Curated annotation (Swiss-Prot):
Gene: hslO
Single annotated GO MF: protein folding chaperone
Pfam families tied to this protein: HSP33
Matches recorded under Gene3D superfamilies: Hsp33 domain (3.55.30.10), HSP33 redox switch-like (3.90.1280.10)
Protein's name according to its UniProt entry: 33 kDa chaperonin
Length: 299
């Protein structure tokens, strides 16, 4: 089944729920970046979180950047997600692998680092982007995003993120967020009930592996709270907007002198997209054409 995002409300629209299945797009990122098991889990969680955060935008061109800079060996983890359902991302050190944690699971927290910062940038596609920064809580990503939502957006939230990786690839990935909206923010009993129910689930990917669907999970959490599942599913996918044309435009920014030096020493130029690992080339005729265009423009 294709990856998708599903929305719901409950408690007379006092609760907002968003769930996303990202199995295929996470495996696409794994293959493109040749990610280790723990790097796959870290980037998969971050991309799912980005899609969930971006789902609140009404502007289709709006995007969210999630950057995690921890003191663990993975280095920077970055995801760029759009309200249109597209997402891309990378891990600075994609081949890092660690032993399982005490529970026998991928040690994402240690790989990310227990200290560091989470940066979130909202870009609506017009005006100036706005950003927030919070310290990492655990490096497990879901807890860090939850802390960001509570401190920077002042929205009580519960977030679950998960990626299950086998030798054959990613077999389950996604996330679920429940938010208590302002109209229900003072209902302490409601908040306590949600927290307990989320805690009882004991993980997101085990539910997917057991054959549970997003509507099933929504029903278990919110079925007795006037649950309203929105009928339209939004397709989500790994997508990068890089292209050969953009690579050539970037080369032109180097200037005529730098391009002449590249032409004389290498006779070609190569660029690898950080987000999708696509490789683009500019051969000698292309470099000569760029130099000619710059020379003409300077006359």
């Amino acid at each position: 089944m294709a990856d998708f995002l599903l929305r719901a409300t409950a408690a007379a629209e006092g609760i907002r729920a968003v769930g996303v299945i990202t199995t295929q797009l996470t495996d696409e990122a794994r293959k493109r970046h040749q990610l280790s098991y723990v790097a796959t889990a870290a980037l998969g969680r971050t991309m799912a979180a980005g899609l969930i955060l971006a789902s609140s935008f009404k502007q289709p061109q709006a995007r969210v950047n999630v950057r995690i800079q921890g003191n663990g060996p993975l280095g920077t983890i970055f995801a760029d997600a759009g309200a249109d359902g597209t997402v891309r991302g990378y891990v600075q050190y994609p081949s890092v692998e660690l032993p399982p944690n005490a529970k026998g699971k991928l040690d994402v927290g240690a790989a990310v680092g227990h200290q560091g910062y989470l940066y979130v940038i909202h870009d609506l596609g017009y005006g100036y982007p706005y950003s927030s920064t919070v310290e990492l809580v655990s490096g497990e990503i879901a807890e860090d995003i939850t802390y960001y939502l509570a401190t920077s957006e002042q929205t009580p939230s519960a977030l679950m993120l998960g990626v299950f990786v086998e030798e054959s690839g990613v077999t389950a990935a996604g996330g679920l967020m429940l938010q208590v909206l302002p109209k229900a923010a003072n209902d302490e009993h409601l908040i306590a009930t949600l927290e307990q129910r989320v805690a009882n689930l004991k993980g997101f990917t085990p539910l997917l592996q057991a054959g549970r669907t997003l509507p099933d999970i929504f029903q278990e959490l919110l079925g007795d709270m006037d649950l309203q599942i929105l009928p339209q599913r939004q397709m989500v996918r790994f997508h990068c907007g890089c292209s050969h044309e953009r690579m050539l435009a970037a080369l032109k920014l180097l200037g005529e002198a730098e391009l002449r030096d590249i032409l004389a020493t290498e006779a070609k130029a190569e660029a690898t997209c950080q987000f999708c690992n696509a490789v683009y080339w500019a051969d000698q005729p292309m470099l000569e054409q760029l130099i000619a265009e710059l020379a003409t423009a300077s006359v």
